[in-house]
């Protein structure tokens, strides 16, 4: 998803734990109900403490093999996909959440400074304009 840039449906995001809930009716009412439910429970985990999936992947050399192969095949010569993979590797292998976040921030800044960034923005908006 991150490398290919393909969108994910809300239902799939919910199933995979990317989001906590989907609003089916009034966003405001659903948001208030969601918050009241969270306030009423004793569980208030921070994102930084939700590491079950990361711990499962730690030490598995093959966990990012598919992403690396996809990047090599479909994003050859592009800078950002390698940085995305490096961010995920840091999240998996770094014990300290703050150190992992710092690495992600550094990789992101490298993407911002890379000359490909501006070219990719032009391509994106050019494709949008051409499809209208």
Feature locations, PLM:
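Membrane-embedded alpha-helical segments that form the functional core of polytopic membrane enzymes
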Residues: 110
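Amphipathic alpha-helical segments at domain termini/boundaries
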Residues: 1-107, 125-126, 131
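Short, structured interface segments
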Residues: 113-132
């Amino acid at each position: 998803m991150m490398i290919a840039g393909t969108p994910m449906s809300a239902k799939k995001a919910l199933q995979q734990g990317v989001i906590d809930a989907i609003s089916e009716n009034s966003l405001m009412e659903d948001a208030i109900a969601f918050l009241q439910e969270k306030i009423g429970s004793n569980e208030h985990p921070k994102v930084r403490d939700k590491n079950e999936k990361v711990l499962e992947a730690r030490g598995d050399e093959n966990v990012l093999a598919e992403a690396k192969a996809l990047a090599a095949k479909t994003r050859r010569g592009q800078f950002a996909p390698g940085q995305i993979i490096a961010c995920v590797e840091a999240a998996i292998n770094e014990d300290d959440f703050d150190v992992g976040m710092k690495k992600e921030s550094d990789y992101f800044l490298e993407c911002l400074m890379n000359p490909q960034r501006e070219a990719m923005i032009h391509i994106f908006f050019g494709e949008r304009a051409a499809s209208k």
